[in-house]
């Protein structure tokens, strides 16, 4: 199975250690989403923009660990999207974004620009 990551799970980011057993397939950008800063990590929500990230091949154990990390408390929900590498899971932020900083570039790696 595959997963699209756009924030702290990306290569050389704060939570990238969760992806140690994953195989990077390549970069990907998804349209019709916007990226917001939640502080130390981002949240993607449906919107008028593009979010940039990476697609990985993962196993069931890694997906279960990521679900425990991302879906606790209802902060994110996993959604199936289409990528050039095949269908992939994506964590979509579930809370209101009012008052949060929009990352105009859609790229967490460029959040400070």
From Swiss-Prot:
Disulfide bonds: none annotated. Gene3D superfamilies: Gamma-glutamyl cyclotransferase-like. InterPro entries: AIG2-like_dom (IPR009288), GGACT (IPR039126), GGCT-like (IPR013024), GGCT-like_sf (IPR036568). GO terms for molecular function: gamma-glutamylaminecyclotransferase activity. GO terms for cellular component: cytosol. Pfam families: GGACT (PF06094). PANTHER family: GAMMA-GLUTAMYLAMINECYCLOTRANSFERASE (PTHR12510:SF4), TROPONIN C-AKIN-1 PROTEIN (PTHR12510). Belongs to the gamma-glutamylcyclotransferase family. May play a role in antibiotic biosynthesis. This is Gamma-glutamylcyclotransferase family protein YtfP. It comes from Escherichia coli (strain K12). The lineage of its organism: Bacteria, Pseudomonadati, Pseudomonadota, Gammaproteobacteria, Enterobacterales.
């Amino acid at each position: 199975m595959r997963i699209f990551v756009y924030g702290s799970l990306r290569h050389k980011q704060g939570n990238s250690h969760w992806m140690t057993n994953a195989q990077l397939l390549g970069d990907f950008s998804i349209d019709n989403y916007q990226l917001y800063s939640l502080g130390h990590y981002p949240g993607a929500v449906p919107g008028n923009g593009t979010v940039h990230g990476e697609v990985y091949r993962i196993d069931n154990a890694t997906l279960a660990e990521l679900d425990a990390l991302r879906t606790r408390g209802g902060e994110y929900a996993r959604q199936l999207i289409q990528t050039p590498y095949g269908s992939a899971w994506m964590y979509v932020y579930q809370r209101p974004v009012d008052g949060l900083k929009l990352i105009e570039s859609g790229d967490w790696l460029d959040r400070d620009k």
